[in-house]
Amino acid sequence: MTHVHTGGDDPGKVAMLGLTFDDVLLLPSASDVIPSDVDTSSRVTRNITLRVPLVSSAMDTVTESRMAIAMARAGGMGVLHRNLSIEAQASQVETVKRSEAGMVTDPVTCSPTNTLAEVDAMCARYRISGLPVVDAVGELVGIITNRDMRFEVDQDRPVSEVMTKAPLITAQEGVSAEAALGLLRRNKVEKLPIVDGNGKLTVLITVKDFVKTEQHPLATKDSDGRLLVGAAVGTGGPQWERAMALADAGADVIIVDTAHAHNRLVLDMVAKLKAEVGDRVDVVGGNVATREAAQALIEAGADAVKVGIGPGSICTTRVVAGVGAPQITAILEAVTVCHKAGVPVIADGGLQYSGDIAKALAAGASTAMVGSLLAGTAESPGELILVNGKQFKSYRGMGSLGAMQGRGQGKSYSKDRYFQDDVLKEEKLVPEGIEGRVPFRGPLSQVVHQLVGGLRAAMGYTGSATITDLQQARFVQITAAGLKESHPHDITLTTEAPNYYSR
């Protein structure tokens, strides 16, 4: 590339030309690849592979337990935001892990002395329809389900008076999934307790889990058949306690989530987490925008590096602080060191269309973290808003005033993401994000279908049978005229497409 003198005596003062998604297109290649036949699986961390290379953002209007469950069932993964109390975030991890399992190895139980009201509250919390009943030593003495409680008026009655009492249909430890399914089918029951030789409950198998497995064949699961889930932590305040609680709750990935990860606090947190819980949880560091920052995270032990400073639609870091790097260039810089170390890159932010996801992966990222494209789905926790007969959902940056002030939830846990946890007066906060709304998009499954469909099309055009192949694709830099030509033009739009909207 020809370097243009920008003034001054230091030719390296302007480091390089920065490119983002609208500045490039993927060049088509000779191909015998059919989009429906491509393999979209890719690593999100050193040790975890997703069927679909999509991760939902750790934002309080994008990912809570409902979104995380839906993302994992679709083949991706959700990262639970940290603008919650430690207990609430850990509880959401538990909700995801308990939502689906081939065998529930630590089933929620109740005692014969619990009241129906207490059982109903537990069922609502964990979104389950019934509980095994165990005595003080853990021996199975009965089971109580919605069917037992449906017509009970007195919610103070003890479980022992309403439950279906032992002997129950059970199986011994070591039973195969096929044999368990046979018992469920023959006895027409929905729950099969697994007991040891002393009659103590060890595992619970439910028919719903078999049904869910059939309904969601791409679901990403751990070795115990539970859905994968990630969770975000910071560096300030009680973040170590938060990380330990999340690990104990069963999180598969912990992301040290900050606006600037090339910082000693972040690097130390990553290293400390790897030393303490690295044998059971993968640790991700972010966000960065330079190869030096990526290298620092690798040396700290990160299992993946998250790239993106300021590309998000709700982020104002680049104009408030004047800092960042266009996302394609940031990814290209990070992968120069990450690929050599075998560490995956997560491209976080700036994705407006499915084609941008393909570009991010072609630049070298292994997965893409998506925020605005998912904020409008039914599963996002954002508020549903009706404006002139059209539905929208609220969407805000974690650096917005609302997020840092805790508006809508009483207390903020996100200030330290922007290193402002020492700011005691709300009027002294310096926001690096905005609040807004996005169109309601319907169920997540439909949105993910379109996003993955666009990725598959890109893989077909570039002759890429796998994501690794796609990373070898080449770009062409385009002009403003080329971008204008890329979008629909010289026509009045009469019917909207599910995967395109004009800006």
Where in this protein do the model-derived segments appear?
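Terminal amphipathic helices with adjacent charged low-complexity linkers/tails
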Residues: 82-97, 133, 137-153, 184, ...
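Short beta-strand/loop segments at the ligand-binding rim of alpha/beta enzyme cores
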Residues: 49-56, 102-107, 222-232, 274-289, ...
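Catalytic beta/alpha-barrel core
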Residues: 79-83, 109-110, 130-132, 170-172, ...
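Bateman/CBS regulatory modules and CBS-like beta-alpha motifs in cytosolic regions of diverse proteins
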Residues: 36-50, 57-59, 88-128, 134-135, ...
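Catalytic cores of alpha/beta
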Residues: 66-69, 241-249, 283, 289-307, ...
